[in-house]
């Protein structure tokens, strides 16, 4: 169940608080009955899966055809995704730390906004208003992406959705003003691929898994960093995601002292179009066939377990490899080091006075989306309100 957040007002708290901390992620169905709606929203999102003019026709068709298969996958991992549980836990624990280290912006209120599953962005925004933010009362909210590496198809899509619902529930469509007085002031933590705390949390999980191999074999274990793939049409447009994922991998290997051979591979390709490779499943099969059977898979772009780790990596890739030497590093989940990293990132952002990173204001070279342009203008422009 979602954590109940009591209503708060500016007058009852510190001079700059309360602060809403909104964790953004793709989400996942909590039960098998929710799979159909989850897939319908996912395949309707042209930012994530671009199908062009046929999006409205092909999206529903693909989602209906895939629903029975995906329901079986969620049934195999316990009946639903744990991503909501972990997101609510991580955000709640982070806010407890922030209340201690940043009393001037306290209390910090945790919220979760998923792109394709409950709680959806619309639900989150409605709760913000019900809890005393905006609607003439002002207040600050931080959209904290839980994709460490930025992509227009993930963080960008979530921000497009947030911007849409902000306009519908607080903006011009509601009261006729683009920037109504007393609306929520937003800022964005839009990427954090090489934050030292993130790198340390990943590195310690890798070290823990390496320790399960005999000492004489340990240095020869191949580390396979696996991230969600992207369509090449998105990559060729100039999306920064591949470079930022590679930066995370390099930072983790640097922290490990480049102790092992390693490669970066990509998972979760959907459909016949070209996607970023090499694929994780093909990579594991290739090395096992060559006799390299000691492999550690590291989910490097995910902040918690979900279907891509618990089913795709654990039950498909590792199980089909058929060798006990093929293992997976634990996901970040409830790692205290990771949660402290989240708090450190948020603390630095709250003190920094900027509404987003310098990178976020720069569009991809091949971007032609007017929605993306207007969304970026909005969030970049919020810096003017933060300095008031």
Predicted regions and their residues:
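Active-site-proximal alpha-helix that buttresses catalytic centers in soluble enzyme cores
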Residues: 2-388
């Amino acid at each position: 169940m979602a954590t109940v957040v009591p209503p708060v007002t500016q007058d009852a708290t510190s001079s700059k608080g309360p602060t809403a901390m909104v964790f953004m992620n793709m989400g996942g169905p909590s039960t098998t009955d929710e799979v159909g709606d989850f897939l319908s929203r996912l395949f309707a999102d042209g930012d994530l899966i671009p199908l062009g003019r046929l999006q409205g026709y092909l999206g529903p068709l693909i989602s209906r055809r895939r629903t029975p298969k995906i329901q079986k996958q969620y049934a195999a991992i316990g009946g639903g995704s744990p991503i909501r549980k972990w997101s609510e836990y991580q955000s709640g624990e982070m806010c407890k730390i922030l209340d201690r280290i940043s009393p001037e912006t306290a209390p910090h209120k945790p919220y979760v906004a998923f792109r394709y599953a409950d709680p959806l962005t619309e639900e989150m925004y409605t709760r913000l208003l019900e809890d005393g933010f905006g609607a003439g009362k002002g207040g600050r909210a931080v959209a904290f992406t839980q994709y460490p590496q930025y992509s227009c198809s993930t963080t960008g899509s979530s921000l497009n959705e947030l911007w849409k619902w902000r306009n519908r529930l607080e903006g011009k469509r509601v009261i006729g003003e683009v920037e109504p007085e007393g609306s929520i002031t937003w800022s964005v933590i839009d990427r954090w691929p090489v934050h030292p705390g993130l790198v340390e949390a990943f590195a310690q999980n890798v070290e823990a898994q390496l320790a399960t191999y005999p000492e004489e074999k340990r240095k020869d274990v191949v580390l396979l960093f696996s991230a969600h793939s992207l369509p090449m049409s998105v990559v060729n447009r100039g999306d920064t995601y591949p470079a930022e994922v590679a930066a995370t991998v390099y930072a983790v290997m640097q922290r490990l002292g480049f102790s092992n051979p390693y490669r970066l591979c990509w998972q979760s390709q959907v459909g016949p179009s070209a996607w970023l490779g090499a694929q994780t499943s093909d990579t594991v099969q290739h090395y096992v066939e060559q006799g390299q059977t000691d492999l550690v898979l590291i989910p490097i772009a995910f902040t918690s377990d979900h279907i891509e780790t618990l089913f795709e990596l654990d039950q498909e890739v590792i199980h089909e490899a058929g060798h006990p030497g093929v293992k997976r590093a634990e996901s970040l989940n409830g790692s205290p080091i990771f949660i402290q990293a989240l708090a450190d990132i948020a603390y630095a952002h709250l003190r920094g006075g900027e509404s987003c990173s310098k990178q976020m204001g720069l569009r991809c070279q091949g971007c032609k989306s007017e929605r993306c342009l207007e969304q970026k203008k909005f969030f970049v422009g919020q810096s003017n309100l933060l300095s008031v």
